[in-house]
Amino acid sequence: NCHNKINRAQLNAEEIEKEMAAISKTGLQEILILTGESRNKSTVEYIGEACKIARKYFKVIGLEIYPVNSDEYTYLHECGADYVTVFQETYNSDKYETLHLAGHKRIYPYRVNAQERALQGGMRGVGFGALLGLDDFRKDAFATGYHAYLLQRKYPHAEIAFSCPR
């Protein structure tokens, strides 16, 4: 995807406010803010501003963003974010490296440790997901569960969620 030519839209603060207001009128009380993997297109500050706007309308704010450091997760939590989901894709580090040839996403340990940094940054919950099919799905399913289990033991207050691949 690092060479993907698809045009993408990015909302400004006014557009974010308008969308959040419209979505909240449907009765939803939780919102998920998604970005791509580009820090240049969606900076941590931009995501933080979106969280501040969302907090006016929603009780719970989730993020599906690129992995960031603990201080950045703290900032996002202070802006209103409650939980973070990171898709590991596969827990086979050798296979993972063959799938991500360039960019920050290539750094397996940084990505696999994102949920722990989010909890260190004050998030109340984290989500896990493997794509199940890039490697042996049984191994990835087990690794996803074990990853969550280890963090639940270390952070017993944490809310843990699993996302299934589409």
Language model regions located:
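Residue-level preference for long, well-ordered alpha-helices that form the structural scaffold
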Residues: 12, 43, 104-107, 137-141
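Canonical Radical SAM [4Fe-4S] cluster-binding loop centered on the CxxxCxxC motif
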Residues: 1-15
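Loop/helix-junction capping segments adjacent to catalytic residues or to phosphate/diphosphate-binding pockets
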Residues: 40-41, 70, 135-138
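Short, small-residue-rich loop/turn micro-motifs
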Residues: 35, 88-90, 166
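Radical SAM/AdoMet-radical enzyme domain recognition
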Residues: 17, 21, 25-31, 42-130
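Conserved C-terminal portion of the radical SAM core fold
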Residues: 109-166
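Glycine-rich, proline-tolerant flexible connector loops at the mouths of alpha/beta enzymes
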Residues: 3-4, 32-44
